[in-house]
Structure formats: C-alpha cells, structure tokens
C-alpha cells in the first residue's frame, strides 16, 4: 500500500497555509506503485502512468478544412480574379495520387488529402464556376483553409504527460493518434468510516437523539468522482478501543483511510487517540475556514508492510466538504500519481459585505445570479453554519477569500470556484 514514513505529515508551525500544505504533500508523499493497461473506453478518470507519445502525426496528412477548390497560391493574380481549369475531384477518404499542375484547381471536400503541389483552398461559396473552369478572387493568403500534417501534434511529441487525469478530451486525443489502450496507475483503495454515537444508517431505526449519516455518502461520492475504489466500513461508535481496532484492521488493503467526526477536543472525540495508539498522527491546523484542525497520519496494520495514510475530517458536513476538496483531494491526487491541480477562481462581483480574519483562506457558499446590469454576481447563502447541508445544495460554489483580505464591500470582485471545479 502507500509508502509513507511516520513523520511524512509532521509540521511544526502554528497555522499551515494552504500553499505550504500542498507543497508538503508534493515533497513527502509518493504516488502508489502499480500500473495497469486499460482499453481506451475504460480510461476516463484514470491517471496516465507515463508520458503518452504520439506514434503518428495529427493530422496524419495535409488536408482541406472546407468544401471548395484546392489551388497553387503561386498561380493567383494579385490584381483580380484568376481563372483555373478544374482538373480533378477529391472526396474525404479517397486514396489518390492526384498532383496539381500550374493553372489548375482541384475540386476538394473537407478532410480530403491535399493534392501534391496545392497549398491553398478556396471555399466553394467564394468562387464562380463556369463549366470546367473556376474563377477565384484575389486576396486569399497562402495556406488558407488547409490543415497541415502534424499541426495539431507532430509524431513523436508528448500527447499526454504522465499524471494526466484522463477526461473525455484526453481519451479522444489518444484515439485520434491510433491508440487502443493506455498505461494508467492502479486505482486508489480508500476506506471510509463515520464516527459518533448519534449517527445512524439512513433508513434504519432512529431514536430521538440520533441523526442519519450524511458524511459517508458525501465522502463516497466525492472519492468515487475522483476515481477511487471505496470500501464503506460503516459507522463507529465513540469508543476508543473499538475505534483503534477498526482503524488498525482498515489499514490492510487500503492506501488511505478517511473518517469524519470525533477529531476535536470534546470528551467523546477519540479518533486522535485511536490513531496515536496504532500509528502516528499529527494535527494540521490549516489556515482555512470552514475546517477546524484536520488530523493526518499513518496507520499500521497487523503485518509490517501494511500501512495506510489517514485523514480525520471534522463532523459537520460542510466542513467535511471544504476540507475534502482542499486537503484530501490534493493528497489523493498525489497518491494516485496525478499532477497537482491548479484551480483558477474566476472573479465575480459580490452582492454582499463580508469581514474576515487575516492570514487564513476563507470559503463562502454562494449562488450566482444576474445583477440588474446583466453582470454575474454572487449572493451569499443566508445560513453559514458548518452543519447546514442545504447551504451546499442550494448554492453553486464557493467564493475564495485570500489570506490577506480582511473585508469586501458589495461590488468588489472575488474569485469563484464552482462545485464542479472543486470536486474534479
Ligand atoms: P464531531 O466533530 O464528532 O463533534 O461532530 C460535529 C457535528 O457533526 C455534530 O453535530 C455531529 O452530530 C455531526 N456529524 C458527525 N458525523 C456526522 C455524519 N456522519 N453525518 C452528519 N452529521 C454528522
Ligand atoms: Mg462525534
């Protein structure tokens, strides 16, 4: 499983900025071993294990980008129309060794290979046909409406770098260069638990002081979106020995174990102690809100080579979501061999005033709407408690307030990250 040292998550500062957290993950966590070859149709969501090199050029040959007439640019008059003899006809896919001679045009269709010697194509809408001749206007640039072999990707170039998380466009490129299979990293195996004496299975018997488990479903869905194989290990009660036993057993066969709840300093918060008893634990007080301290560690199973990374998230579902996308996701990507992701929050106008503490990154749940002038603006959800799940279902994404910002006024611009951006 994951090759982690006891102190890989150790950090001595007071509040760890997010950028430092990302750097620590890059420096101290190594991707898991294990590569498998998958057919292209099953490759979406997987991570390329090596650079994928183009065995052929894309496109493989010079071809026409339009339906029209292929010509030799050197034949064209700079002063007015040029009359050319239509000497042939080339459909897409037609094998031909047609070569164009001076004074000729070849009728050509989109995707057809350019005749040898032709370098420019007129669109059929722009020419005048008269029997076997065609009159083409002046002013078209050499190379117009033509696509050149390798202009998309030369043969031998890197089509997809190692660590690419394959999505539809990457699979399409691999297919376009003729590949049928790709070497990808094996899927990560992740175990999840919920903790808490008050937490019960949805659909199960619920006594008056119990709540249905939301976090395991949140975590399973987030992890599966990122391509992990999830083992759902259920709900653990707030019992130190039971927790330690369950966590120890879970390390076997898993790269990562994620729990929610029980990590703060209440009397029923035993996750810290349980992890310390069976492995090593550090607390990352990350400079992020929402998201109280996140427990990071390594847990060891019965046999010596069975170890897994551990992340203990807070219990409140919104805090679970934010700490997952900002802390667990970078760790998961690193373990999976994926390149680090750079998020680009898009500036949107805020419709509200907001104050925050300096030196921490803050995330605010917002909906987007059109302002009276038609510009997009962000509206804060009226409830900002970390336990308010509808504040996630009724909004579009998170505004990201940078560390150095302390207040914004209506009309200011703040970076917006959609839930889709955050979860991918
Ligand atoms: P804790 O960190 O264990 O004190 O939990 C903080 C809050 O999150 C408490 O109100 C818990 O009831 C709630 N909570 C913990 N686990 C879950 C869960 N799996 N689903 C929904 N809410 C939870
Ligand atoms: Mg609890």
Kindly give the residue locations of the regions a language model identified.
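Helix-rich terminal scaffold detector
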Residues: 1-18, 180-313, 317-323, 334
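Short, glycine/charged-enriched hinge/interface segments at domain edges or termini
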Residues: 2-19, 69-232, 237, 377, ...
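Intrinsically disordered, low-complexity, positively charged segments
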Residues: 11-73, 77-81
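Generic structural signal for well-ordered, non-membrane alpha-helical segments
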Residues: 14, 18-22, 36, 40, ...
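Flexible glycine/proline-rich
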Residues: 19-22, 36-41, 50, 63, ...
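Structural signal for hydrophobic packing residues in well-ordered secondary-structure cores
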Residues: 29-33, 51, 114, 157-163, ...
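Solvent-exposed alpha-helices and their adjacent loops that cap or buttress functional pockets
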Residues: 62-64, 76-79, 97-101, 114-116, ...
């Amino acid at each position: 499983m994951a090759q982690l040292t006891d102190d890989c998550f150790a950090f001595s500062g007071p509040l760890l900025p997010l950028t430092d957290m990302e750097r620590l993950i890059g420096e101290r966590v190594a991707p898991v071993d294990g590569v498998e070859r998958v057919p292209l149709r099953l490759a979406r969501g997987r991570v390329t294990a090596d650079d994928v090199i183009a065995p052929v050029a894309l496109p493989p040959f010079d071809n026409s980008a339009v339906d029209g007439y292929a010509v030799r640019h050197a034949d064209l008059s700079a002063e007015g129309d040029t009359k050319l003899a239509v000497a042939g006809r080339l459909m897409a896919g037609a094998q031909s060794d047609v070569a164009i001679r001076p004074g000729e045009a070849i009728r050509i269709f989109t995707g057809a290979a350019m005749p040898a010697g032709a370098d420019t194509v007129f669109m059929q809408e722009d020419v005048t046909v008269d029997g076997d001749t065609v009159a083409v206007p002046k002013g078209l640039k050499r190379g117009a409406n033509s696509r050149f072999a390798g202009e998309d990707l030369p043969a031998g170039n890197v089509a997809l770098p190692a660590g690419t998380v394959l999505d539809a466009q990457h699979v399409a490129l691999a297919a376009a260069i003729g590949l049928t299979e790709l070497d990808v990293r094996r899927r990560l195996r992740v175990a999840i638990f919920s903790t808490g004496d008050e937490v019960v299975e949805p659909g199960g018997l619920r006594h008056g002081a119990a709540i249905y488990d939301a976090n395991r479903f949140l975590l399973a869905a987030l992890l599966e979106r990122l391509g992990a194989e999830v083992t759902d290990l259920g709900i653990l009660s707030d019992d130190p020995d039971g927790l330690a036993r369950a966590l120890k057993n879970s390390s076997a066969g898993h790269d990562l174990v994620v729990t929610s709840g029980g990590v703060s300093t209440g009397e029923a918060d035993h996750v810290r102690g349980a992890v310390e008893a069976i492995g090593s634990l550090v607390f990352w007080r990350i400079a992020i809100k929402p998201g109280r301290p996140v427990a990071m560690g390594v847990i060891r199973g019965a046999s010596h080579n069975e170890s897994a990374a551990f992340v203990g998230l807070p219990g409140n579902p919104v805090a679970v979501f934010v700490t997952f996308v900002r802390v667990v996701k970078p760790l998961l990507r690193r373990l999976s061999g994926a390149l680090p992701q750079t998020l680009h929050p898009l500036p949107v106008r805020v419709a509200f005033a907001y104050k925050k503490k300096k030196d921490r990154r803050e995330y605010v749940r917002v909906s987007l709407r059109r302002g009276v002038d038609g510009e997009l603006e962000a509206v804060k959800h009226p409830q900002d408690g970390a336990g308010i799940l509808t504040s996630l279902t009724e909004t579009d994404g998170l505004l990201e307030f940078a560390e150095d910002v302390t207040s914004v006024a209506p009309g200011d611009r703040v970076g917006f990250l959609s839930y889709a951006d955050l979860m991918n």
